Amino acid sequence: MDSSTATAMTAPFIDPTDHVNLKTDTDASENRRMGNYKPSIWNYDFLQSLATHHNIVEERHLKLAEKLKGQVKFMFGAPMEPLAKLELVDVVQRLGLNHLFETEIKEVLFSIYKDGSNGWWFDHLHATSLRFRLLRQCGLFIPQDVFKMFQNKTGELDMKLCDNVKGLLSLYEASYLGWKGENILDEAKAFATKYLKSAWENISEKWLAKRVKHALALPLHWRVPRIEARWFIEAYEQEANMNPTLLKLAKLDFNMVQSIHQKEIGELARWWVTTGLDKLAFARNNLLQSYMWSCAIASDPKFKLARETIVEIGSVLTVVDDAYDVYGSMDELDLYTSSVERWSCVEIDKLPNTLKLIFMSMFNKTNEVGLRVQHERGYNSIPTFIKAWVQQCKSYQKEARWFHGGHTPPLEEYSLNGLVSIGFPLLLITGYVAIAENEAALDKVHPLPDLLHYSSLLSRLINDIGTSPDEMARGDNLKSIHCYMNETGASEEVAREHIKGVIEENWKILNQCCFDQSQFQEPFITFNLNSVRGSHFFYEFGDGFGVTDSWTKVDMKSVLIDPIPLGEE
């Protein structure tokens, strides 16, 4: 490796003060609003170098990983108590190894589901809760009534449970898989949250205290699995009963998957800098954030097509979003939208050069993705993409009309449009196109089914909670918080708490959709869940997507850039 490459490889970030935003001819001659986004902190020379200089996994590590996989498969087949089997599944999943042991995990969970009547988990809070969570995660329905045994005569959870921190933590995590109307689980969530908050600082076992603090910050069901795996590998290493075989395999596999992701990042970065979209002063330059989101949705190496096309469509989508939000006039946006509806370039010469560039990038990339899908999957997806883009741009157009007309819609009207304008119907449809069984299956996503409706609505509301202050400062469209304030006269604090409550309720509906949506199977159900988890990652503490130099860069660097040290072997 030469010195210039070495320099690039050691500098994933750039100094934003060194960045020069290029302006187009229309920027220079017209008074347009600007997004006021800070320049990307990611060094695109470094990102491009990952295509050829990603973390190479040594041959000896590949051989060791295969050996360890065999040992873990033996663990799954060995005689053990049901609770021990559940705990093995839980650790394997949290370490990010479930993609290696899908068959073994299903066999364990189906076996435990069938044997549920023997009652080995009765009166054991941790066992009951873990069994409930893992089986529901797998799509196997367990009723909330299994927790009735922990209630007292008045129907409330017994105070004796407060002494069982491990059991309370399992109950807390299980409660987030509840459905709307499952009051026992609602009570369990409130009960466990209250007592874990009061107890965690006094927990003597450091590993358990760390898990409790982590869970209270955000429950496992709402976390991105790939990011969680990176955190859990480090946390698991500190546990007294840590299994060294699982830990070693988790580290090796994490680095092996990361190497695959890095090669993809490098290739995508090379494409992105050729588009010219990274030079637009008013728009976000967020390729790596888009990749992180695609990785949140579908990190398994076998979903390469889904990941790459989500990034390509998503990166262009972000710029289109910014064009509607802050750049285009209403007349220009109407012309842009009508051109999308016709899927035609005939009228775009009437647009300013910047919007022509954006339209052609959207048009060409979508058609390229369609051709790739035709080649790799054997069916024509372009009509599906066109429908999704039309729906997308019409939602942007409506928000622009609200803004330019000074109109604040009621929350319900805003939400129905906002669940489309957030962009996740388009991105999830992109992911679905990459895994669909055949061309006929593409009809399932139009009109928007409940699974996509509620996952997209959740992402919209979570986005609004995190981005409202920044977007209002930029002069962007109103958000759900402000619609609710205008509709009800509530304060911002009350409105924010209301939207948080709506998020919790819609998570319950989405949980149920995962069982009700018989027309969709895995992995698309998990794609939808993971898209919402990605929203929690990027927006839980602010705008971690639009503001690149935020708390998210630490996790992104640890997941996408830095391999886990393997230590002595």
From Swiss-Prot:
<dbReference type="Pfam" id="PF01397">
    <property type="entry name" value="Terpene_synth"/>
</dbReference>
<keyword id="KW-0479">Metal-binding</keyword>
<dbReference type="InterPro" id="IPR036965">
    <property type="entry name" value="Terpene_synth_N_sf"/>
</dbReference>
<dbReference type="GO" id="GO:0010333">
    <property type="term" value="F:terpene synthase activity"/>
</dbReference>
<feature type="binding site">
    <location>
        <position position="325"/>
    </location>
    <ligand>
        <name>Mg(2+) 1</name>
    </ligand>
</feature>
<keyword id="KW-0456">Lyase</keyword>
<feature type="binding site">
    <location>
        <position position="471"/>
    </location>
    <ligand>
        <name>Mg(2+) 3</name>
    </ligand>
</feature>
<dbReference type="GO" id="GO:0016102">
    <property type="term" value="P:diterpenoid biosynthetic process"/>
</dbReference>
<dbReference type="InterPro" id="IPR034741">
    <property type="entry name" value="Terpene_cyclase-like_1_C"/>
</dbReference>
<feature type="binding site">
    <location>
        <position position="463"/>
    </location>
    <ligand>
        <name>Mg(2+) 3</name>
    </ligand>
</feature>
<feature type="binding site">
    <location>
        <position position="284"/>
    </location>
    <ligand>
        <name>(2E)-geranyl diphosphate</name>
    </ligand>
</feature>
<dbReference type="GO" id="GO:0000287">
    <property type="term" value="F:magnesium ion binding"/>
</dbReference>
<feature type="binding site">
    <location>
        <position position="467"/>
    </location>
    <ligand>
        <name>Mg(2+) 3</name>
    </ligand>
</feature>
<keyword id="KW-0460">Magnesium</keyword>
<dbReference type="InterPro" id="IPR008949">
    <property type="entry name" value="Isoprenoid_synthase_dom_sf"/>
</dbReference>
<feature type="binding site">
    <location>
        <position position="321"/>
    </location>
    <ligand>
        <name>(2E)-geranyl diphosphate</name>
    </ligand>
</feature>
<feature type="binding site">
    <location>
        <position position="321"/>
    </location>
    <ligand>
        <name>Mg(2+) 1</name>
    </ligand>
</feature>
<feature type="binding site">
    <location>
        <position position="325"/>
    </location>
    <ligand>
        <name>Mg(2+) 2</name>
    </ligand>
</feature>
<protein>
    <recommendedName>
        <fullName>Probable santalene synthase</fullName>
        <ecNumber>4.2.3.-</ecNumber>
    </recommendedName>
</protein>
<feature type="binding site">
    <location>
        <position position="463"/>
    </location>
    <ligand>
        <name>(2E)-geranyl diphosphate</name>
    </ligand>
</feature>
<keyword id="KW-0464">Manganese</keyword>
<feature type="binding site">
    <location>
        <position position="321"/>
    </location>
    <ligand>
        <name>Mg(2+) 2</name>
    </ligand>
</feature>
<feature type="short sequence motif" description="DDXXD motif">
    <location>
        <begin position="321"/>
        <end position="325"/>
    </location>
</feature>
<dbReference type="InterPro" id="IPR001906">
    <property type="entry name" value="Terpene_synth_N"/>
</dbReference>
<feature type="binding site">
    <location>
        <position position="325"/>
    </location>
    <ligand>
        <name>(2E)-geranyl diphosphate</name>
    </ligand>
</feature>
<dbReference type="InterPro" id="IPR044814">
    <property type="entry name" value="Terpene_cyclase_plant_C1"/>
</dbReference>
<dbReference type="InterPro" id="IPR008930">
    <property type="entry name" value="Terpenoid_cyclase/PrenylTrfase"/>
</dbReference>
<comment type="function">
    <text>Catalyzes the formation of santalene.</text>
</comment>
<dbReference type="InterPro" id="IPR050148">
    <property type="entry name" value="Terpene_synthase-like"/>
</dbReference>
<comment type="similarity">
    <text>Belongs to the terpene synthase family. Tpsb subfamily.</text>
</comment>
<feature type="binding site">
    <location>
        <position position="460"/>
    </location>
    <ligand>
        <name>(2E)-geranyl diphosphate</name>
    </ligand>
</feature>
<dbReference type="Pfam" id="PF03936">
    <property type="entry name" value="Terpene_synth_C"/>
</dbReference>
<dbReference type="InterPro" id="IPR005630">
    <property type="entry name" value="Terpene_synthase_metal-bd"/>
</dbReference>
